[in-house]
Every structure is written in structure tokens, then in C-alpha cells.
């Protein structure tokens, strides 16, 4: 009996740690944007059934843009990384039957909900592009990292399957 519980607890710990790590990366990008007076952010690139994330920065004063990242005008600041590399069994996405953080049916299992460009940008004035990033563990652990655009505030949420609701961590 103790082994399944321990595995669930470990899965939840890994997923929660990944969510906090991601929230910290976003907060760090926001701080860099304010400190350097230029837009910084994270770029999410689909790769097989998951995403890689890369730190990026504006290179010409008009914000971070995908075409400018490809052409080299905007800068890539880090190597692409998979969240599961640091937090085993964790990936972007939804578990079957889990609603989004607004309580609506998820529709798709895609866990990166930040717009078609897949860029989460923090601006020099402290604002950000809005969106929610969903992380799932091996078991039933489900967390979300939500960015509020006007304030740039970052929240970590946990899905409680028994109550079928999201709660702030």
C-alpha cells in the first residue's frame, strides 16, 4: 500500500517542482526585461509530443518576433531545454478529462496556451503576454503556470481531481 502512495507523492513533487521552475524562469525573464529595458521571453517549440523552451531577447526595440529570431535580429539566450530533462516524467499537456484553469473542457491536450507564435514575452514596463502553460506528471499530477498580461504576475495552480477544481499553490 505504501509504494503506490509514495510513487504518487513523488510524481506530484516532480510536477510541482517543474511548475515552480517554469514560474521562476518566467519571473527571471520579466526581471531581465525591466532591468535591461528590452523585451525578454521564452519561446516554446513543439518537438514530438512535447515542447522545448528557449530564453530569447529583443534585438532591435520592436519586441520579440519569431521571424526576427529565425533571421538573427532577435537573440536566442539559451540552448533549447525540455522540462522533462530536469524533472523526470513531466511534460507540457493535459491529462484526459482535466478542464483548463477557467473550468472549461480543455478541448485539446496541448499544454502551451500562449498564442500561435508560442512566445511568452515580458516587456520593459513589466507587462507580459498572457497565457497558461499546463504541466502533467507521469501519474495524475496536473499543474498550470499562468501569466497575467497587465501585471506580469505569475501564478502556479494545482488541479485537484477529487474536487475537479484548480487551486493556487
Please identify what each model-predicted range represents.
Residues 1-24, 31, 39, 44-169:
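N-terminal helix-rich module
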Amino acid at each position: 500500500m505504501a509504494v503506490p502512495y509514495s510513487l504518487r507523492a513523488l510524481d506530484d513533487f516532480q510536477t510541482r517542482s517543474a511548475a515552480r521552475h517554469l514560474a521562476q524562469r518566467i519571473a527571471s525573464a520579466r526581471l531581465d526585461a525591466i532591468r535591461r529595458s528590452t523585451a525578454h521571453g521564452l519561446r516554446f517549440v513543439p518537438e514530438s509530443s512535447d515542447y522545448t523552451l528557449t530564453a530569447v531577447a529583443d534585438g532591435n526595440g520592436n519586441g520579440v518576433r519569431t521571424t526576427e529570431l529565425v533571421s538573427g535580429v532577435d537573440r536566442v539566450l539559451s540552448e533549447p531545454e525540455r522540462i522533462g530533462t530536469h524533472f523526470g516524467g513531466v511534460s507540457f499537456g493535459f491529462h484526459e478529462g482535466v478542464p483548463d484553469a477557467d473550468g472549461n473542457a480543455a478541448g485539446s491536450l496541448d499544454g502551451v496556451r500562449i498564442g500561435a507564435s508560442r512566445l511568452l514575452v515580458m516587456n520593459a514596463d513589466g507587462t507580459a503576454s498572457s497565457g497558461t502553460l499546463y504541466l502533467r506528471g507521469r501519474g495524475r499530477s496536473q499543474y498550470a503556470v499562468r501569466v497575467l498580461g497587465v501585471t506580469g504576475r505569475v501564478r502556479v495552480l494545482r488541479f485537484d481531481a477529487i474536487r475537479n477544481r484548480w487551486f493556487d499553490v
